[in-house]
A protein has these predicted regions:
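C-terminal motif of bacterial Sec signal peptides marking the signal peptidase cleavage site
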Residues: 12-15
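Start-of-domain marker
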Residues: 19-107
Length: 310
């Protein structure tokens, strides 16, 4: 069957948000997805859409955890799940509709309507991209809302005083170290160590090479190992990936400590501050050698999107 020629924006992404008063909290972890359909072929196709691996990690890791339930609609067994995707046969083009918080708080309900299993397979690339982006935006929004309600005001004021910008710091990240136009915040975790750095440099430096070079110089000056010469560097043997998020430039890649075995993933958000002729960057990096990192990085990435120029 010929693929339908529609751009992602024409997937009919219709949102409906219900009031949260009196509703229970949804069940499940971020990026948990429950698929509901009567047709096994539809379940298999959409499940395949969720099988992507997350970019910018040392090893391949899937971001989404998927379970399936057979049925036409949401029922008592599935209605409180965090993200529910109902796949239905309907006449017309393949399209997506979604609702926020229909049965519970912090919940996303997605309907994928398609005329047939063959049509859904033909449209799978564009449908998958739209579905993944929709769930990712939902999880980012939930995380940012949580941080606004559970933040570390003391460290937020430290960043504001040192850098002259605003960023929402989660309440469970408490340790900090300051330098010149630089703040390093960490939870000092033993199994997984989560870190956020915020820094500013003079001049507007937003090209890809400038962002990487700037990162190396700032991190080498402020994050050092136990012995002389141990400094943090960007891993140049792996690609650094760049994307846009509004006015911000997002970079993803790997870091390592020169002269040591430490390393892991990082993600950064860079903003030009034209009024002060400077460049602001907020970065998250993780050291977790024996555990998965995808969801931890996504959770920290949501923190970075709260970066705001005063």
């Amino acid at each position: 069957m010929k693929a339908l020629a529609f751009p992602i924006l024409l997937l009919v992404l219709v949102a409906c948000t219900e009031a949260n008063v009196g509703k229970p909290q949804s069940v499940g972890e971020p990026y948990d997805v429950t698929l509901v359909a009567t047709d096994k072929r539809l379940l298999k196709t959409v499940s395949g859409m969720m099988g992507v691996t997350m970019a910018g990690l040392p090893q391949e890791e899937r971001l989404f955890t998927v379970k399936t339930a057979k049925g036409k609609e949401v029922n008592a067994a599935t209605m409180y799940e965090r993200t529910i995707v109902v796949v239905r046969r309907q006449d017309g083009n393949t399209r997506i509709r979604y609702e926020r918080n229909p049965y519970a708080r912090d919940q996303l309900l997605v309907f994928i309507d398609t005329p047939s299993a063959e049509a859904l397979r033909a449209d799978s690339a564009k449908t998958a991209k739209a579905l993944q982006r929709l769930i990712d935006q939902f999880e980012t929004r939930v995380a940012m809302n949580h941080d606004r309600q559970n933040h570390n005001l003391k460290l937020m004021r430290t960043v504001e005083k040192t850098i002259g910008c605003n960023i929402t710091i989660p309440s469970d990240i408490r340790a900090s170290k300051t330098g010149k136009d630089f703040v390093w915040i960490s939870d000092n975790g033993t199994r997984t160590m989560r870190n956020i750095c915020v820094y500013a440099v003079n001049g507007i430096r937003t090209s890809q090479e400038e962002i990487v070079s700037l990162r190396d110089s700032v991190m080498a000056a402020n994050i050092k190992g136990e012995r002389e010469g141990m400094v943090m560097r960007t891993e140049r043997r792996a690609d650094v990936m760049f994307s846009r998020h509004g006015k911000a430039i997002v970079a993803r890649g790997l870091w390592h400590m020169e002269g040591d075995a430490m390393g892991g993933p990082f993600v950064s958000v860079t903003l030009p501050d034209s009024a002060r002729n400077r460049t602001l960057t907020a970065e998250a990096f993780v050291y977790a050698p024996s555990t998965t990192k995808a969801r931890t990085m996504k959770r920290l990435e949501a923190v970075l999107y709260s970066l705001d120029i005063e």
